[in-house]
């Protein structure tokens, strides 16, 4: 018996009907083979539109439904639920996007948009006739979560999940949690001491009964699927026993070796045995074997006997139900902007370096100085958008926090010494957050910070005084301005971590063109990813400030808690399937599979492919490569795809004749 198809065309207000003649599309659809009813409605996704579809299914005994509307990314689940409530399999729906594919791209050609919509509907009807029900598989979800990254995003997510009773493994590659926020002096717009508000959370997460900290460690491999991720972690040797070290510092006091301190961005020094900063969590010392001379003084000074020169890397294997990626960011490499002389001129520094200077616990005791001579600068110039909004260095995006960083540090400099002249050379001041515009006005009106709209072309150094000549066109005044500065601060942008591609491949995630992790939907699913059970948070997803980072971390914790709370997850089995009678065992499909989901068994004297339908993600690579057609992707079988193409071409011929 031939399937009975119903076609439902949505106006989407004027988004579709303003360009596409929806009534003509309906009239065309009514005449297609197998179509027993076709209807239009202004908003098919609204309750009246949904009821229209349900009533038509019952009245006309429909067993296939075609909806011509907007993007399936947003509304396909809505219509699947609709036909399911009417008694049909949710997989007997074929969704046609006539908004993005017709009205939006042909908005100046009503006839062309309408014809294209007709052709797409014709193809959809042919495919709908061949749709199949898709089975579902229920997997148990382990009530535990791996969080990659121990910055404020990872800490907040860990606390939220731990408070709900879930086991959390918080992995941080540095010796201490805290991330970038731990390096800051104060936070805008409230000027809170950064560590004063961060440290209590660091201590809370370390002492939480449901949170296990795994610091100085990196994720090396991730396999499996939602509910059952198998994770391999390599914990680097500290050469200090974490369970014995008391953090007293006696070892560092006798260590004769001093090297640049990475936490202070090289502005200060640390010993070969060290903690990154005084409030580090865990407060456990680490020996830097690249610089340790094995003199043994630390071992002699250590009362508890915690030094372990023979410590080896440790492999940790975990099974978790969900994962949150919160790996943070790196500061843009300002040496790539050669015209600004960073790394060449001593008195050109970055915002983060200034943060460490201004921090009372930093290398200069909270005093901004000129690196060339240690003197206090009396004229400071900030240059904005260094590594942001700059196609020349491949950074098209705005880093979002640099303007506020500069405003904060400019005010702090003026607070330390009101006589200091501070200039900010900017393209646009983007003070978008709550209280940010008022903060901007305060810098202008209360502190007298001077703003020059323009991007400096270059910086030159006076070789004798080490002063810097900043030449910039003030686009508001229409004139060239030269400033002789004691110190230049580059507002370096936020760059994705260089190992993001490696981690993305490991997790099965995508990266945006800018190198940050890609969300499932930028507006409706900003913390979810294409892999069920894996969420993203903080600057791993894209540049953002601390409030947005914390909010997104809480959102990610909420997202992964849902399947853990339910204890199980339904997987729709749109997976590869094998026709064993046709399979020749050539093994081409296994070579194409990125998930190692295909194995082979011997049957009737030759090899036959087998698919692990849980490991398989339904990408279709194997089906596309199979020379015999034995490997098919359920719901996207060859005949289903070809029938759609045939339907489009036949309709095109009919409309053109």
From Swiss-Prot:
InterPro entries: 4Fe4S_Fe-S-bd (IPR017896), 4Fe4S_Fe_S_CS (IPR017900), FAD/NAD-bd_sf (IPR036188), HdrA-like (IPR039650). Keywords: 4Fe-4S, FAD, Flavoprotein, Iron, Iron-sulfur, Metal-binding, Methanogenesis, Oxidoreductase, Repeat, Selenocysteine. [4Fe-4S] cluster 1 binds at residues 245, 248, 251, 302. Binds 4 [4Fe-4S] clusters per subunit. GO terms for biological process: methanogenesis. [4Fe-4S] cluster 4 binds at residues 593, 616, 619, 622. Its EC number is 1.8.98.-. Residues 235-266, 283-312, 574-603, 607-636 form the 4Fe-4S ferredoxin-type domain. [4Fe-4S] cluster 2 binds at residues 255, 292, 295, 298. It is an enzyme of class 1 (oxidoreductase). It comes from the Archaea. Its cofactor is [4Fe-4S] cluster; FAD. [4Fe-4S] cluster 3 binds at residues 583, 586, 589, 626. Part of a complex that catalyzes the reversible reduction of CoM-S-S-CoB to the thiol-coenzymes H-S-CoM (coenzyme M) and H-S-CoB (coenzyme B). The ferredoxin:CoB-CoM heterodisulfide reductase is composed of three subunits; HdrA, HdrB and HdrC. PANTHER family: COB--COM HETERODISULFIDE REDUCTASE IRON-SULFUR SUBUNIT A, FERREDOXIN:COB-COM HETERODISULFIDE REDUCTASE SUBUNIT A. This is CoB--CoM heterodisulfide reductase iron-sulfur subunit A. It comes from Methanocaldococcus jannaschii (strain ATCC 43067 / DSM 2661 / JAL-1 / JCM 10045 / NBRC 100440). The gene is hdrA.
């Amino acid at each position: 018996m031939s399937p009975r198809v119903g076609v439902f065309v949505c106006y989407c207000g004027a988004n579709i009907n303003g360009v596409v003649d929806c009534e003509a599309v309906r009239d065309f659809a009514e005449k297609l083979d197998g179509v027993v009813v076709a209807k239009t409605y202004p908003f098919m996704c609204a309750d009246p539109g949904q009821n229209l579809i349900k009533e038509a299914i019952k009245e006309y005994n429909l067993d296939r439904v075609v909806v011509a509307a907007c993007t399936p990314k947003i509304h396909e689940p809505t219509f699947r639920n609709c036909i399911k409530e009417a008694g049909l399999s949710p997989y007997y729906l074929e969704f046609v996007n006539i908004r993005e594919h017709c009205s939006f791209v042909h908005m100046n050609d009503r006839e062309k948009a309408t014809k294209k919509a007709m052709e797409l509907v014709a193809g959809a009807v042919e495919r709908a006739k061949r749709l199949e029900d898709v089975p579902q598989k229920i997997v148990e979800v382990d009530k535990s979560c791996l969080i990659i990254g121990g910055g404020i995003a990872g800490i907040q997510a860990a606390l939220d999940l731990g408070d709900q009773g879930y086991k959390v493994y918080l992995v941080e590659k540095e010796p201490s949690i805290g991330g970038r926020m731990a390096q800051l002096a104060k936070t805008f717009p409230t000027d809170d001491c950064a560590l004063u508000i961060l440290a209590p959370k660091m201590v809370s997460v370390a002492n939480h009964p449901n949170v296990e900290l795994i610091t100085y460690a990196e994720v090396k491999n991730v396999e499996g699927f939602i509910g059952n991720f198998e994770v391999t972690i390599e914990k680097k040797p500290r050469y200090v026993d974490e369970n014995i070290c008391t953090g007293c510092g006696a070892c560092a006091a006798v260590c004769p070796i001093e090297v640049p301190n990475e936490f202070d961005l090289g502005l200060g020094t640390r010993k070969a045995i060290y903690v990154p900063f005084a409030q580090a969590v865990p407060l456990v010392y680490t020996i830097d074997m690249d610089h340790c001379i094995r003199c043994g003084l630390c071992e002699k000074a250590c009362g508890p006997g915690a030094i372990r020169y023979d410590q080896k890397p440790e492999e940790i294997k975990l099974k978790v139900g969900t994962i949150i990626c919160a790996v943070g960011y790196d500061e843009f490499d300002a040496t790539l902007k050669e015209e600004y002389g960073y790394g060449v001129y001593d008195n050109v520094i970055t915002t983060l370096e200034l943060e460490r200077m201004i921090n009372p616990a930093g290398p200069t005791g909270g005093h901004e100085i000129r690196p060339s001579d240690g003197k206090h600068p009396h004229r400071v110039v900030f240059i904005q958008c260094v590594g942001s909004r700059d196609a020349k260095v491949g950074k098209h995006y705005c880093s979002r926090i640099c303007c506020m960083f500069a405003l904060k540090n400019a005010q702090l400099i003026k607070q330390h010494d009101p006589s200091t002249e501070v200039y900010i050379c900017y393209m646009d001041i983007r003070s978008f957050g709550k209280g940010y515009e008022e903060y901007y006005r305060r810098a202008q009106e209360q502190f007298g910070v001077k703003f020059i709209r323009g991007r400096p072309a270059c910086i030159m150094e006076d070789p004798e005084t080490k002063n810097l000549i900043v030449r910039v066109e003030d686009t508001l005044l229409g004139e060239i301005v030269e400033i002789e500065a004691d110190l230049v601060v580059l507002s370096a942008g936020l760059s994705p971590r260089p190992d993001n591609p490696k981690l993305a491949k490991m997790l099965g995630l995508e990266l945006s063109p800018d190198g940050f992790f890609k969300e499932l939907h930028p507006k409706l699913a900003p913390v979810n990813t294409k892999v069920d059970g894996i969420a993203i948070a903080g600057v791993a997803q894209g540049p953002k400030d601390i409030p947005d980072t914390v909010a997104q971390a809480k959102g990610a914790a909420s997202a992964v808690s849902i399947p853990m709370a339910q204890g199980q997850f339904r997987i729709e089995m749109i997976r590869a399937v094998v026709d064993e009678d046709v399979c020749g065992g050539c093994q081409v499909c296994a070579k194409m599979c990125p998930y190692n989901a295909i194995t082979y068994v011997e049957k009737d004297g030759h090899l036959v492919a087998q698919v692990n339908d849980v490991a398989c993600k339904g990408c279709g690579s194997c089906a596309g490569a199979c020379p015999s057609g034995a490997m098919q992707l359920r719901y996207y079988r060859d005949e289903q795809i070809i029938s759609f193409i045939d339907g489009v071409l036949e309709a095109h011929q009919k409309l053109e004749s």
